[in-house]
Amino acid sequence: MTRGKTTPGSGTARAGTTCRGRVSFVGSGPGDPGLLTVRAAELLHEADVVVTEVPEHADLVRAVCGATEAGPELVDGGFGEDGQPLTHAARSKVVVRQAKRGLRVVRLMAGDPFLYASGPEEAQACVKAGIAFEIVPGVSSVSAVPAYAGIPLTTKDHREVAVVTCGDKVDWAQYADRRTLVLLSAVGQIGDIAAALVAAGRAPETPVAMTRVGTTTEQATVTSTLERIAVDARAARMAPPAVTVVGDVVGLRDALSWFETKPLFGWRVLVPRTKEQAGTLSQRLRGYGAVPDEVPTISVEPPRNPQQMDKAVRGLVEGRYEWIAFTSVNAVKAVREKFEEYGLDARAFSGLKIAAVGDKTAQAIAQWGLRADLVPSGEQSAAGLLEDWPEYDELLDPINRVFLPRADIATENLVAGLVDLGWECDDVTAYRTVRAAPPPAPTRDAIKTGKFDAVVFTSSSTVRNLVGIAGKPHPSTVIAVIGPATAKTAEEHGLRVDVMSPKPDVEVLVDALADFGAARRLAMVEAGQPVTRPSDRKPSARRKAGTSR
């Protein structure tokens, strides 16, 4: 974040806006970016400036607005130019100063803007300065964190709830009844609070749950009683931010815990693909509670000799081909870029049959306004495509030539199979796959020292390239592969394969990893052991290569 420093594309009122500034006090919610409200996202898109004291909000703004130079300026509301922490009054001056520049200011605040005193104080400063403002509530941690911990605040038998911001002047005697209590800022004084509640008449065995960094993949919950919560919280090293629930509703957590029990909860999973390629895979991993870390191992580059591709595209337009076969999304992208270079569009495919390997490739074709005539009914591979490919028939097929835009490292199996079926093939290098640059040093260190819980390999080349640019994953890391060929390559590099997808599909691969994680978790629970992640345990000896499926 900047400290009064303007980033490119921001810092001045956008074209088409008036010069009257406005402040939107926006709650970011309790931590999960998915809980950001629709109105909050709209305002972030429209903002000229975002003022926040929360470092993690920079990632949130980038996720909502995209990593573009035209995005809003981020102004540090936590520290001044002298490096000293800002008071509420000083932060209010920062907000007002930005609005007086005629900018649309989003004051992005953790949780809900009016849950704590800072929001109202800064809004009052806007009133005094004559600055228009609005309040956009965030999903409150009061309700969200217990919900993510599997604890309802009310039931048919417990309908009263009290929310208490803990401090030195709380009269705990007024909370001696059986109503549910939600305690904020209680971590440091939970022992004194519990003792005061017991002294006021609460039963020592009253259930208590304390949840730290709720709604995030670092969430952790300790369940205890008023009598033991101080000891148990200390043993679990609980620290702020945390929300504490006191009352019988805590007893429902065993049955209703849904977030922390996800099969890959908190797992840091290495995804050796580009962000563009990893979208679906990473999204599915997040659904199972994992934290994907995308590390490109392959860089896609244009062919060294573009003449071959130019000639093939001209031949396509002139009607030299009966079929075009796309074996990857990258192949679709390469042909589409060449079309745009020549000023062509999808009409050039008129009369041409289109084949695609894999649903994602077919979807990429569909985004072009085209529909694949042939997608393998079985295995999504060159072999699967050959099984369904028709033999050349002189009566039915006026042209016997196939255009294959592929990578420079593609195998000859598809070409040989098509020739056996009577077709002639133009096997054209549409793009090159080259080894990507090594990841940053912290990532390489995490790979080698076992800080990743799992790595997901989607091809043999990702295995070879990851080992080449970053080193071999630590023996404690779970290795998941998309199929037998990738498993063989992993084993050749001294890795033990723990999970293999039953079919060559990235979503099925993630499901298989989740099944592995669920079985691992269940085994720990049944053995009475604490549930840990693979990175929490380091074996004393390196694992030997060999497949466990």
Spans of model-derived segments:
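Class I S-adenosyl-L-methionine
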Residues: M1-V136, A176, A242, G319-A334, ...
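Short, charged N-terminal beta->alpha structural module
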Residues: T2-C19, V139, I151, G279-R286, ...
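Class I SAM-dependent methyltransferase SAM-binding "motif I" and its flanking Rossmann-like core
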Residues: R3, R14, G21, A110-R178, ...
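Residues that mark the start of a beta-strand
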Residues: R22, R104, T180, P207, ...
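Short beta-strands and strand-loop turn motifs
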Residues: G27, V75-G78, V105-M109, A209-V213, ...
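Short, well-ordered beta-strand core segments
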Residues: D48-V51, L74, P152, L181-V182, ...
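Conserved beta-alpha
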Residues: H57-A58, E69, I135-P146, R159-W172, ...
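Conserved anion/nucleotide-ligand pocket segment
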Residues: V170-M210
